Structure formats: structure tokens, C-alpha cells
UniProtKB/Swiss-Prot annotation:
It comes from Aliivibrio fischeri (strain MJ11) (Vibrio fischeri). This is Tryptophan synthase alpha chain. The alpha subunit is responsible for the aldol cleavage of indoleglycerol phosphate to indole and glyceraldehyde 3-phosphate. Pathway: Amino-acid biosynthesis; L-tryptophan biosynthesis; L-tryptophan from chorismate: step 5/5. The active site is at E49 (proton acceptor), D60 (proton acceptor). Its EC number is 4.2.1.20. Belongs to the TrpA family. The gene is trpA. GO terms for cellular component: cytosol. One of its GO terms (molecular function) is tryptophan synthase activity. It comes from the Bacteria.
Length: 268
């Protein structure tokens, strides 16, 4: 049983969903970034989703672009990122670690080299934000060869065919993209998410974790109620780093409070 399977089985027993925060490695600097990842896990994060800083993050909003800039300014390189992941992995042998990256970064030293480094550092999954399923073969084959789950996005507008492909090709978990989480009053996860989940289950997809615009406990609760296996929170986590970057103590306290309240909301 791999780390994701073990996690979902454990959460099912406890009747909980997964809370997965996203941060960019090296934001605001490599040393503090390690403390941040440690703090997130200690405060209740079930898994981590991590970005490797990149100068042109297409799919990211301004908050995560800011994280990339801070990390690059503090001289964070992919090599430093893999070192930090390996350090977290040795301290937390059971916590699933996923990467969210862009194809250019994977191509930089060759696809195989990238996945070999992931394997060595103890990464469990890789989501390449700008590679759709129909262009994923080369990445997927290398990932699987190195024991890494390829993660795919199921967008709200996906056709049944797309969902079936995502279900068939993905492993670890399915990243369910929800536009349902952007504004307060209208975020009732409602039909679209429930329908998508139903479809994904029909196709026997890996457990679906809802991401995009998840910033408060009520949304996590909604995601889990709608049948998602958990929720990913990126911008909201990164915003706390942005706000408190000058004061590490306040920063780690804010992340602890945020993570524990989001995790508490995963109880069914």
C-alpha cells in the first residue's frame, strides 16, 4: 500500500477527509520554508502539495506568483528544493508529498532525470499544471517507472470522456478543480461537484481532492460533504506567508491556527 492509499484508508476509519495545504518551496527563504512544511504537518496537514519555484507560473494567480518571486529571490534552486523534500521525508516517513510543477521545469534536465530526483527525495506524486492528459504519455511513463503517481486535473467543464481518461491515467489522487470555491455566498459545492464526483467514482478514479479557491473551513466541510476525499488550499496558505514573512514566529503561529481549523473541518 502506498502513502496515499494508506492515508485515505486511515482517514476513512476516522471518518475524515484530507486537508492538504500547498506552499512554494523556498518561500520566503529555504530555511524558513523547511520550518513552514514542518509546522503544516505538525498542525494536522494530512499531505503536502509543494511547488518548485519557477519564473513563469502560468496557471497561478498573483498570490502564488508572489511566492515564486520570493523563493527565487532567496536563491532557491530545484536542487535545494529536493534537499528540503528529502529532509521532510526523513522526518515524516508516512506523509504523502506531492509536487505541482510546470513542464519546462520537468524538461530542464530531461524528464527521466526529474522523476529520478523525485524518487530519490521521497516524492509521491507529480502534477504538471500545463500538461493535459493527451500530452502526458512521456511524463506518465517516466513517473510510473520511478514509482511516482501522475496526478491529473478534472476540471468542472470536463466531458465524460475526459473524466474517464483522468480516472484511467491518474494515480494517488485526482485533483478536482472547483470554480465553486471562489466567492463566499455562492460556494455551495452544489450539483456540479457532486456530479463530477459521481462520474469519477463510476470510472473508478483515484480519490478526488477539491482544489481552487478553498480558503476557509466551511468550504472544506462542504467539499467533504459533497463526497470529495479532501480539500487542497493554496493561495490562502501562501497569503499567510506573504503577510507574516518578516516575523517567522507570527508566521508559524498563523499557519498552525489556519491548518488546525481547516483540518478540524474535515471531520464528517
Amino acid at each position: 500500500m502506498d502513502r496515499y492509499q494508506a492515508l485515505f484508508a486511515q482517514l476513512e476509519k476516522k471518518n475524515q477527509g484530507a486537508f492538504v495545504p500547498f506552499v512554494t518551496i523556498g518561500d520566503p527563504n529555504p530555511e524558513l520554508s523547511y520550518n513552514i512544511m514542518e509546522t503544516l504537518i505538525e498542525a494536522g496537514a494530512d499531505a503536502l502539495e509543494l511547488g518548485i519555484p519557477f519564473s513563469d507560473p502560468l496557471a497561478d494567480g498573483p498570490t502564488i506568483q508572489g511566492a515564486n518571486i520570493r523563493a527565487l529571490d532567496s536563491k532557491t534552486t530545484p536542487a535545494i528544493c529536493f534537499e528540503l523534500i528529502a529532509k521532510i521525508r526523513s522526518k515524516y516517513p508516512e506523509t504523502p508529498i506531492g509536487l505541482l510543477v510546470y513542464a519546462n521545469l520537468v524538461f530542464a534536465n530531461g524528464i527521466d532525470d526529474f522523476y529520478a530526483k523525485c524518487q530519490q527525495a521521497g516524492v509521491d506524486s507529480v502534477l504538471i499544471a500545463d500538461v493535459p492528459t493527451n500530452e502526458s504519455q512521456e511524463f506518465r511513463e517516466s513517473a510510473i517507472e520511478h514509482g511516482i503517481h501522475p496526478i491529473f486535473i478534472a476540471p468542472p467543464s470536463a466531458s465524460p470522456e475526459t473524466l474517464e481518461t483522468v480516472a484511467k491515467l491518474g494515480g494517488g489522487y485526482t485533483y478536482l478543480l472547483s470554480r465553486a470555491g471562489v466567492t463566499g455566498a455562492e460556494t455551495k459545492a452544489g450539483m456540479p461537484v457532486a456530479q463530477l464526483l459521481e462520474r469519477l467514482n463510476q470510472y473508478d478514479a483515484p480519490p478526488a481532492i477539491l482544489g481552487f479557491g478553498i480558503s476557509e473551513p466551511a468550504q472544506v466541510e462542504e467539499a467533504v460533504k459533497a463526497g470529495a476525499a479532501g480539500a487542497i488550499s493554496g493561495s490562502a496558505t501562501v497569503k499567510l506567508i506573504e503577510q507574516h514573512q518578516a516575523n517567522p514566529e507570527a508566521l508559524l503561529k498563523a499557519l498552525t491556527d489556519f491548518t488546525s481549523s481547516m483540518k478540524a473541518a474535515t471531520q464528517k
